[in-house]
């Protein structure tokens, strides 16, 4: 007679999954909003739209962390990639004026390492808490044979809400409007395939002091900056005509996504100093300047476009909220079919 098999024998540990849920409950609880009905653990999560909205529009976004995760595996650094995961989605929906309401995560692995997964999801909860977004649920998928030992993948899903009349589309952007840039916290979650290639080829001392007391390793793995609370504070007082979250495609490919076809964002390359991380990447990888602008955020994580008469006040308010804000340039008329972001 053959030996009796269990799910654990097949590589799936239900007890480990249950332990992870218990571990993350306190973190998730701290993120809750009054709109959330019920607790973690149900088949679905219930969220009501607040009565303060007359004509609410839901805005959704989904994203991952990309190959930055490979560095997390190699360096055994798992406590900040969850922040990256949240930031990539909530910053995206923020661009349309949405206040993030709730977030769900998907964590997939070959064998569940409970302490490591706890670190990851603790970071997700931290990102949610910092952006005022409720972590209402998720999926932990233990799939034997699907991932190498010690590796996992992440996906995140954010939903926010905005009054219909306040949806930011970029359609009102016009000639003479001012382009502001909010400083990034490093490479955020994009360009890491190139970063890893540069590190592999250059073989730098990752633990030597690199910038302002940080090592190169710390500079490379630094989490994506969350812009939610400062931008929402600005939206309470001013009209923001358009925003661009600078992600894959860098500055030159993301800003046009919010511009009317007859306009160009003319950005002065001297209006901000290229942070040391990007200086090193460009030099070590011998990366051409235009390739830098279309691959990395180059120190600008969010672009905000406002009327000229509001620019000083918006810049000041965002500065009071803790952001470093640069006046990058102006919106001008487009000539022919020229690219809609010009950095010079």
Swiss-Prot record:
It catalyses: 2-formamido-N(1)-(5-O-phospho-beta-D-ribosyl)acetamidine + ATP = 5-amino-1-(5-phospho-beta-D-ribosyl)imidazole + ADP + phosphate + H(+). Pfam families: AIRS, AIRS_C. Pathway: Purine metabolism; IMP biosynthesis via de novo pathway; 5-amino-1-(5-phospho-D-ribosyl)imidazole from N(2)-formyl-N(1)-(5-phospho-D-ribosyl)glycinamide: step 2/2. One of its GO terms (biological process) is 'de novo' IMP biosynthetic process. GO terms for molecular function: ATP binding; phosphoribosylamine-glycine ligase activity; phosphoribosylformylglycinamidine cyclo-ligase activity. Coiled coil: none annotated. It is an enzyme of class 6 (ligase). It comes from Neisseria meningitidis serogroup B (strain ATCC BAA-335 / MC58). Keywords: ATP-binding, Cytoplasm, Ligase, Nucleotide-binding, Purine biosynthesis. It comes from the Bacteria. GO terms for cellular component: cytosol. This is Phosphoribosylformylglycinamidine cyclo-ligase. Its EC number is 6.3.3.1. It is found in: Cytoplasm. Disulfide bonds: none annotated. Belongs to the AIR synthase family.
